[in-house]
């Protein structure tokens, strides 16, 4: 591990030298790439330098134990205790920082929420989930744009798709994919009975046609008239667009905009992200077979979380974590849960790495 860290430190120092060169500063593209590489290494190098400094201080304090002065010995022991407590924590931090980075972590995400079993109550829950993620995105300083939505008469959503843009959105949101189950008394329920319904969430890295090399001949576009809640026509022109990726059969429909051109652009954005996610799912499946352990796939088929309103609790079934702060959670205070999921994924990755070596 330490040879690897020393190698990264040399790389970091080399990048610092290059960035101070006027020649590099004049080439904006090269400067941008070097700045990014420098930024990626900065944290791990800084932690390693502190770790190395602490080891040097530990050796120095052990030397001081040989001193004949009891006061100096006592001070040295105190320092040794403090350093020996800190070193394992820093070593663990370095191991985490050395884990291979997910190349998609920096990306924006396309968030799809669909009402599942439970009829109108499921559609209302889908709307609640979208609002929850919207609040969280606002707290994080991210931007949210609705790409497509299918609203119900009561203000719920059969489906809503949004683009969340900002700093490392995918790294925080990628574990939200799956089936979210809700247990609560619907507003229309007169007997006070608790109903169970569900919504599915898919979090996909934003992609573009260039990244995926989508060929025009692989795409089919169909146009039709937009319809609103209850199926009534809301447009007299054929502005809604359905995009089909012929090789995979993946289909996206967009009708939110009055312009056919805008609906087509949004449809392509969603399609590209679905294709990239399909590639990512396949890669994760291959990795899982190799390691015999599934690390953070965002599997959409399984029930991942239950929201129990009568008890005011949220339980994430993947990590067996229950939080009793449902009201705050639904207002977007989901950071604690996301942190726990990220920590769990890192722990699993460390275990998998240990099994490989």
UniProtKB/Swiss-Prot annotation:
Keywords: Cytoplasm, Methylation, Protein biosynthesis. The modification N5-methylglutamine is found at residue 232. It comes from the Bacteria. GO terms for cellular component: cytoplasm. Methylated by PrmC. Methylation increases the termination efficiency of RF1. Disulfide bonds: none annotated. GO terms for molecular function: translation release factor activity, codon specific. SMART domains: PCRF. It is found in: Cytoplasm. Transmembrane segments: none annotated. Belongs to the prokaryotic/mitochondrial release factor family. Peptide chain release factor 1 directs the termination of translation in response to the peptide chain termination codons UAG and UAA. This is Peptide chain release factor 1. It comes from Oleidesulfovibrio alaskensis (strain ATCC BAA-1058 / DSM 17464 / G20).
